[in-house]
Regions:
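Membrane-embedded alpha-helical segments that form the functional core of polytopic membrane enzymes
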Residues: 21-25, 29-63, 71, 99, ...
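Transmembrane alpha-helical segments that form the membrane-embedded catalytic/substrate-channel core
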Residues: 49-57, 119-126, 169-186, 218, ...
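Multi-pass membrane catalytic core of lipid/isoprenoid biosynthesis enzymes
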Residues: 71-112, 202-226
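Intramembrane alpha-helical segments
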Residues: 84-154
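Juxtamembrane boundary at the C-terminal end of a transmembrane helix
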Residues: 277-287
Length: 287
């Protein structure tokens, strides 16, 4: 039982769940009515397996850094519950399985986009960007922003502009989300020589960037209404949620308490979840 739990934790389940929610939103927005439940479940399974594979590869590559950081030292590999070889083999198996499911039961486009996201996160971000530039989150964030597009393409077999707009929302949301956490964990990142923005440019500069990105996010979040993708209910929700995010970011900017950074980080998770819920409610409940 402990071994199964170790493999489960290797996949970063909380991250995968959030990605699946975003993918599901893309699926449900791709059509005016709910598609085949079977198609949705199979697509989510394929995306989940590939996402879990990417997370496992990330933990294999980052195992030494994970062992040295309080936030990650309880992961299966640093704890000795899994070897790097076994974790790598597991990642390969579920990654291939997920890709095959998408190829044979969904469509080739979704498989290609999902594998591109896997490669972007597991290799381009983890191997290179994470330790190469303080803009690692900005550049690498595209891979993490892909789930709505994956879900949309699973239903429509197209790359739709509306799906790309959902990707843009997550892409702009990602830097303030992670930089808030990076402020709270800056000493650990510095110890491992990981060039997160608070380490390379200081906390004050990072706080300013968080404020600027939340302003940009405010603008981007209302675009679905402007392009007639959504209605008034979503607009009110987006304005309210984005205003709250800006409140937290401004509060963080003027605070010397790192705990405020963690509160900002936690709110950002609620933000992205609720704004997508608002999109769904507007799409299906308000006709």
């Amino acid at each position: 039982m402990k071994l199964l739990r170790s493999y489960y934790l290797l996949c970063k389940p909380n991250v995968v769940y959030m990605m699946l929610i975003c993918a599901l939103v893309g699926m449900l927005l791709a059509e005016d009515s709910v598609s085949s439940i079977t198609t949705i479940m199979v697509a989510l399974l394929g995306i989940a397996l590939c996402s879990g594979s990417a997370a496992a590869i990330n933990q294999v590559i980052d195992r030494n850094a994970d062992a040295a950081m309080t936030r990650t030292d309880q992961r299966p590999i640093p704890q000795g519950d899994l070897s790097a070889l076994h974790a790598s083999s597991f990642a390969l198996v579920i990654g291939v399985l997920g890709a095959l499911i998408l190829y044979f039961y969904i469509n080739t486009l979704t498989m290609i986009l999902t594998l591109a996201s896997l490669i972007g996160y597991a290799f381009i971000y983890t191997v290179y960007l994470k330790r190469a530039t303080p803009q690692n989150i900005v550049i690498g964030g595209l891979a993490g922003a892909a789930p709505p597009l994956l879900g949309w393409s699973a239903i429509s077999n197209t790359i739709d502009p509306y799906a790309l707009l959902l990707v843009l929302i997550i892409f702009v949301w990602t830097p303030p989300h992670f930089w808030a956490l990076a402020i709270y964990r800056k000493d650990e990142y510095a110890k491992e020589s990981i060039p997160m923005l608070p380490v390379t440019h200081g906390v004050a500069f990072t706080k300013l960037q968080i404020v600027l990105y939340t302003i940009i996010l405010f603008i981007v979040s209302v675009l679905p209404y402007i392009v007639l993708m959504s209605g008034f209910v979503y607009l009110i929700s987006a304005i309210t949620l984005s205003s709250l995010f800006m409140y937290y970011s401004i509060k963080l900017y003027f605070s010397d308490d790192d705990a405020v950074a963690m509160k900002t980080f936690n709110f950002s998770i609620y933000y992205i979840f609720l704004i997508f819920v608002a999109l769904l409610c507007d799409h299906y409940l308000i006709q």
